[in-house]
Design a protein with these regions (language model features):
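Catalytic-loop region of hydrolases
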Residues: 20-65, 73, 363-365
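N-terminal cap/lid subdomain of alpha/beta-hydrolase-fold enzymes
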Residues: 50-113
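Conserved acidic catalytic loop of the alpha/beta-hydrolase fold
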Residues: 114, 125-145
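Conserved hydrolase catalytic core segment
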Residues: 142-183
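Alpha/beta-hydrolase-fold enzymes
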Residues: 167-168, 173-256
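Short beta-strand/loop motif that positions the catalytic acidic residue
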Residues: 295, 301-303
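Conserved alpha/beta-hydrolase "acid-adjacent" motif
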Residues: 308-314
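Catalytic active-site module of serine/aspartate enzymes centered on a nucleophile-bearing elbow/loop
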Residues: 324-365
């Protein structure tokens, strides 16, 4: 009943949507014997990616767009195109996909001994290290114009700036923080528990997807995705079909929140999210203040004013320690999804300010 509305929501937060014409074809980069932070070695770590535009002769027009939760490489097309912040005629855009999204190496597509629940937890730093190799080995790229990321993509952008401080000219972060703070871990643990409590989950060795657990996961997620004001003002009516009610909207959200997603994949990426903390980067002694203070490129930090995943106060706290930061909250009732341009007003705000930041020269080192 709410299929059109659900598709809108999934596109808005980057879980799907059509590719731009003649661009965005996905490819695989495979790393043999890739060693994770945990010490586990993946025999063939696969990173899916797509590119838009043309790499220039100097190889200096590259912008990296790392994916967010369960997203594919098409999750940033609200930012790409003529008249938007990232014109493929000017930039060579590389969009990558996190481990665990079901296409890059994931519990659902990896053979024994790392199949299903035996797939090792991967960190944000593992993902960044793999993409660093992709850029150098597959594309011959040694420097980036920018790293731009929404949500878990923003987590990766922060990690890039700490791990590879001279590899890019600037970073843009929307609806994300440099660390998953305790309240965020509470949310993620609640969603993991919701899936694992379903007897059909069978400790991850299920024969069919644990439907009840996935619906419980979706119900919790729905309560955090948008702001209280979004529900109060019934902003869901903007794209809902005629006759939709609060109940049909909520039912449509939780009953099939991420169509086709695998439970172990969902959990793997939540574990990645939980462990995010740039302070635990080797050399910083688990001190996030030191890690943030090491960032030597300009940062455009755009939290959503109503994000329940990444509260704006957490962003304000982190900016105290970042040397060259512009904090620009997104004035929106669309909660977490504001950072992915989930409506025309937020899309214009993001494109205008990210586009201006990309063109700015005075504050660049």
């Amino acid at each position: 009943m709410l299929r059109c509305f659900l598709l809108f929501l999934l596109m808005a937060v980057g879980f799907g949507g059509p590719a731009l014409a003649a661009d965005g074809d996905r490819r695989a980069f495979v790393i043999k014997n890739f060693t994770l932070e945990s010490g586990t070695i993946l025999p063939a770590a696969k990173v899916m990616y797509a590119t838009y535009g043309t790499l220039n002769a100097a190889r200096d027009n590259v912008v990296l767009l790392p994916s967010h939760y369960m997203a594919d490489a098409h999750g940033y097309e609200w930012l790409i195109g003529p008249g938007k912040a990232l014109d493929p005629k000017k930039y060579f855009l590389v969009a990558t996909e996190l481990f665990g999204n079901g296409k890059s190496s994931s519990p659902s597509n990896t053979l024994a001994p790392f199949d299903g629940p035996r797939f090792p937890v991967t960190s944000i730093r593992d993902n960044v290290a793999a993409v660093h190799r992709l850029l150098g080995e597959a594309l011959g790229v040694q420097h980036l114009r920018a790293v731009i990321g929404f949500s878990m993509g923003g987590e990766q952008a922060f990690q890039w700036a700490v791990t590879y401080p001279d590899f890019m000219d600037r970073i843009v972060v929307t609806s994300a923080t440099a660390k998953t703070w305790p309240h965020g871990i509470v949310r993620l643990e609640s969603e993991i528990i919701a899936i694992e409590t379903d007897p059909a989950f069978a400790s991850g060795d299920y024969k069919e997807q644990p439907k009840k657990g996935l619906q419980a996961f979706g119900a919790i997620w729905a309560g955090w995705l948008f702001s209280q004001g979004w529900w109060r003002e019934e902003l869901w009516r903007i794209d809902a079909p005629p006759g939709a009610t609060f109940r049909t909207v909520f039912d449509g959200l939780y009953k099939d929140f991420i169509p086709g997603a695998d439970a172990n994949d969902l959990i793997l990426q939540m574990r990645t999210w939980e462990g995010h903390d740039v302070g635990t980067t080797p050399g910083f002694g688990a001190d996030i203040k030191r890690a943030l203070g090491s960032i030597n490129v300009p940062v455009l930090y755009m939290p959503s004013e109503t994000d329940l995943y990444f509260p704006v106060d957490d962003a304000r706290y982190e900016t105290r320690f970042i040397p060259h930061v512009t904090l620009l909250p997104i004035p929106s009732l669309w909660g977490h999804t504001a950072g992915a341009a989930s409506n025309p007003v937020d899309a214009k705000f993001l494109n205008d300010h990210i586009g201006a930041f990309m063109e700015a020269k005075g504050e660049l080192r």
